[in-house]
Amino acid sequence: MYPWSSTGTSPFSHPDNEGAESGDMSMGEEQQQPHQRRQKFNNLRACQSCRASKVRCDQPNPGMPCLRCQKSGKPCVDAASQPGKRQRQPINSILEMESRIETILSSAELQDSAGDGETAHSTALRSPSQLSHHIQPFQHLPMGFAIPFNGGNSGTEDLNSSIRSWLNDNITDLDARTTETIFSHYLTNMVPTFPVVVFATGTTAADVRRNNPILFLAILDVASSGFCALETQRKLRKLIVQAYVHCMLRTEQYTLGLLQALIVSATWYRTIEPVEPGEQMDIYQISHTAANMALIMRLGESLNAKSWGGPMFPRREMKKGPGSAFQADSLEARRVWLGCHYICSNTSMSLRAPNIMRWTRLMDECLEVLENSPAALLSDRLLCQHIRLQHITEEFAMHLSAEEASAPAKSRAIQIQVTHRAFKRQLSEWRRTVGDGWDAHCTATSDDVPEDNAQRLTPPPPIVAIEPHAITEFMDTIDNIFRVFTSLDMSTIRALPAMYLIRIIYTFIILVKLYFAAAKLPAQDAVLQVDGLQVSRRFNRVIQMTAGWGPLWPATKLTTVFTKMRSWFESGGDNNCQRLQQAAAWLTGWELKPPSQGRDAHAMNMAEVVSDDGSIVASSSRGPASWVPSLASTDVDTLAFSHEPPLGTEFSIAPPPFRSMSCATKSCSPQAGAAEFMHDEEVPLEGQRLGDLPNIDQMDDVGMDWSQYTNMGFDLYNLDAPFLPNPPSGFDPDAAMKDNCADRNT
């Protein structure tokens, strides 16, 4: 029997309360009932005030306040009524979150009851943050031309179906025959200039429209000029811009088809004049967006998983090598990866900013697979030549930038020349790898540009001195560029990538600057040099080429620009002195060194000349400086390619990005001059059938503002014109070159 059973009390009774009231309980009595004392302290709980102060709660009478609360006058909360501490377990919050997710998923499935089982399954795998983003209704895009995206699901299928339905409802004049014609024009005339987004033999416009509508929309946007009404082209442009905004900002559904569409829009970008709200498209933003999407998609990691490890792993190379069937399913992704690198590299060099897609071993593996895989297309080898040439250009620019930052001033010029010659050898090796069947004229040189705006604004403008032997190289290169460009018909020019047109315009700016440099010579020498340039004849020839094509892109733009340039050139009549006085400073910043000074120049062709204010302009100075190009070893070579329609590619080593050789300023920066020239509204337009042409207030010849890239480094020998077809039998390029030189000397 328990001890408390003899007294008839329960274990929860307090027999010592009466002794506690009298206060005369002795120690012996407490020791006689140890179990009741322990029970008392185990069952009684302190009030809230005593628990907060962590002191003993002395409550003589049950139901009455404790002694401490009575003395302080505080309310004594009954200890028995105080709830116990709730033990929160982590599993409870997780279960609560899962129940909420299940509720959201069930509501989403009810809203999207029309969707198939596969779509519902993919929706169930989304994270809560993504799900809360997707189930919200889309806001209207600020384009003034809304795409009818369905419901709340922003998946790829929903976007594709929305684009397809929009095309069917709003572009009624684009029937199946017209779209097939535009698609055939893209495949036949535009793809050969840069075959990065290609299709298998037998692919039709209906197939692309059904499987990849956003890519089909991008192709219609860049290739529809001349095949449909202008209003239809504007609808296509607004839709593709709105689709890009939606994919970039309002969804995370990134696919290879979206990357292909961005590459197409960036490569063959064009403007529709006049630009209306909702039609603005930034070519630089598109290029970097494509590269960022490729990185976010981890496209490079997916391709790295197919790596064969190089020659150190022969067994793995036999199984997963570039010529194995294992690589056949990755060809399209490799083209997209190389295409993103290409357009991003061109953009970064134009903006003089770092390229976010640096060259890695993966790029080399992509080139090997595209060149050796049995499943590769014929155009893939041509694409690889484009990529390799751009890589040589970018590496050359990076090496010059590193030498500018690290080399001492005295040895900088020598190191630059050594680097220049080394990369010219790489360019020669690239030439030898090109296939047979095409002619390409390749030249290379270096150039120097200012580093920052403060240097460009430093007066007075420097003098760029040109060695006597270099003027021959200048003229030979311009002759070849002019011959290549004028040999093309306008249908071929219209299919060229946008950047080629900018560089052709820059070549003619160089021609005008050489004219004013030759006009500074003594009378007899000036006549010989000016006659050899044939500036008026060349301008008349290109204007005649482009003026007859009316408003088609890029005929109107090229005609307007070349006419303005001719107006600058002919503004002073036949008097050279008057022309020099009326011409802008950026056109007259060059001078030709007399032969006597040319003999004293050192071997690296870097010279010091005196500017107009008498200050010495040195190649190694950080202030105003002169640049004497080294072109002694630059030759114009003729080599062959083998593919069918005309092809355009890059053949020159451009100036380095994000660097300054501190050897030029605004006066010798063609881009700065071009911007000034294109903003001059006082120069009248000349030429026949040009009265209805719109005035251009900015250098927007390919839909890009020249102010965005005033430092764009296009060198004088940048022959970015398409390849020529096979020459007629018996054609001797060396003899033709000699005849051209003989005509100039006579």
Swiss-Prot record:
Q: Where is this chain's protein located in or outside the cell?
A: Nucleus
Indicate where this protein is primarily found: nucleus
Domain of life, source organism = Eukaryota
- Keyword DNA-binding in annotation: yes
Pfam family of this protein, just one?
Zn_clus
Q: Where is this region: Disordered?
A: 1-40, 109-131
Q: Which UniProt keywords apply?
A: DNA-binding, Metal-binding, Nucleus, Transcription, Transcription regulation, Zinc
Which SMART domains is this protein grouped with?
A: GAL4 (SM00066)
Listed Polar residues bias regions: 1-12, 120-131
Q: Any coiled-coil ranges, and where?
A: none
Summarize which parts of the chain are annotated to bind DNA, as ranges: 47-76
Query: Per UniProt, what is one GO molecular function of this protein?
Result: transcription cis-regulatory region binding
What's any GO biological process attached to this entry? regulation of DNA-templated transcription
Can you cite an annotated GO cellular component?
nucleus
Does Amino-acid biosynthesis show up as a keyword for this record? no
InterPro entries in UniProt? prtT, Zn2-C6_fun-type_DNA-bd_sf, Zn2Cys6_DnaBD
> So what does this one do?
Transcription factor; part of the gene cluster that mediates the biosynthesis of the diterpene ent-pimara-8(14),15-diene (PD). Acts as a positive regulator for the cluster gene. Down-regulates the expression of the penicillin gene cluster, two putative polyketide clusters, and one putative nonribosomal peptide cluster.
Q: What is this protein called?
A: Transcription factor pbcR
| Species this chain originates from | Emericella nidulans (strain FGSC A4 / ATCC 38163 / CBS 112.46 / NRRL 194 / M139) (Aspergillus nidulans)
- List the gene name: pbcR
